[in-house]
Amino acid sequence: MKQPSALSALVEALRALPGVGPKSAQRMAYHLMQHDREGAEKLGRSLLFATEHLQHCEKCNTFTEAQICEVCSDTERDPTLLCVVETPADQIMLEQTMTWRGLYFVLMGRLSPLDGIGPKEIHFDRLVKRATDGVVKEVVLATNFTNEGEATAHYLGQTLKSRGLSVTRLARGVPVGGELEYVDAGTIARAMLDRRSI
């Protein structure tokens, strides 16, 4: 039996979400249609509202409803410090630590040549323009510690250092509350290499 075309279209749309395969998308679609049509309508309205009202901040590239986001508009922030992150979700995580008082630049991805993601796709030119505006003194690279994140940090670091900026990278090591017995060898090795005096 063939699915109705409207249901097939819904399943395909749900598959666009990260980590959602055909079976999960089908389960979600059937759940929404069988048990939560009101929730489905709310989801549809919310998606439409977000696509119509969210844009990229002109300065840092994160999502905002205004031309300039709240963080970039905050005069209490230190404009000489710029933290580079891969996604708005990474920016939110750093904000939750309440340890960063500088500004941000959100790449909206990371370098991944095999996936066709190069400097243009991560807004490299905008980052360089922002970092070399004469105000920024230090750039903190807070990309993830994946192969792509490391490659992105290396590429950005080399380019920004060649323009006279101080470039630092987030430290790595044993997590707070972590026991050495349960931490992988690579993390312990990096923590040992990045040790500091007390």
From Swiss-Prot:
Q: Which InterPro entries match?
A: DNA_Rcmb_RecR, Rcmb_RecR, Rcmb_RecR_Znf, TOPRIM_dom, TOPRIM_RecR
Domain Toprim as annotated: residue spans: 80-175
Gene Ontology molecular-function annotations? DNA binding; zinc ion binding
Name the source's superkingdom: Bacteria
Q: Which PROSITE patterns match?
A: RECR, TOPRIM
What Pfam families does this protein's entry cite?
RecR_C, RecR_HhH, RecR_ZnF, Toprim_4
Q: Which UniProt keywords apply?
A: DNA damage, DNA recombination, DNA repair, Metal-binding, Zinc, Zinc-finger
Q: Which GO terms describe its biological process?
A: DNA recombination; DNA repair
User: Where are the C4-type Zn fingers located?
Assistant: 57-72
The record, for PANTHER family, names: RECOMBINATION PROTEIN RECR
Protein family: Belongs to the RecR family.
Primary role: May play a role in DNA repair. It seems to be involved in an RecBC-independent recombinational process of DNA repair. It may act with RecF and RecO.
- Entry protein name: Recombination protein RecR
Source species of the chain: Paraburkholderia phymatum (strain DSM 17167 / CIP 108236 / LMG 21445 / STM815)
